[in-house]
Structure formats: C-alpha cells, structure tokens
C-alpha cells in the first residue's frame, strides 16, 4: 500500500522544535480520545447495511486524513508528509478467538471501503502480514 510522500525541509519547518523533542521516542504517536454522539451515523450505517465497526474505521481515518499533522511520519530519519494514510485494524477470528491485523487501503467511498475491508478481513488467513506500515492509521473504537 505504499503511498507517496514528500520530504520536509526541517530547517524551515515550523514544527521542527516539537519534532526534535519526540524524534527519539519509542513510539512517537499521537493519541486522541473523545466522546461523540454517533446516533445519526449509526442510523445511516444500519440503513446502508454496512458493518458499524468498518464504517467507523473508515470515518475516523477519513477525518484524520484531512488533518495534515496526522500524515507526518519519519522515513529513513527524515520527516515526510504522506499524501494519504491507509488503515490498519484488528479483526477477531471467531473460529479461534484470536485477532488478526488487517491492512486496507483508504478509498474515497465508505461503502466501497467497507466491502473491501470485509472481504480482506475474511480472506486473510494469517494473523500478522508483517510489521505495520509507516503509512497507516489504527484506531481503537469504544462504543457505549
């Protein structure tokens, strides 16, 4: 799923100081937790016959892609800005009770994404396809 990116000139970059602080972190990640009223979203997903979980992965990652700061990564020690970030999510294998990590490219259409994600998750036989790529979002959804 290798997406294209551009290398950032850190000398002229307004985020250079912040980058220097976190550059050597074990996992320089950005985590956000928030409450959201998803009543209308749930209704729409149900009407469309989509998986709630896959639709939410799509929606969160679609929004995150619109925020430039969330698309920065380190590539070979340099700061890179990706044109887009794909998705990675966990999916429970109901036969074994074990989860697998599924990588799915981000698409423009939610229904197409959900169909591809469901197909990919169902057909993927291995639990891990390798280390997570540098160009993915992974969200953890909690619904009350």
Language model: regions and residue ranges:
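Basic, often amphipathic N-terminal segments
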Residues: 13-18, 23
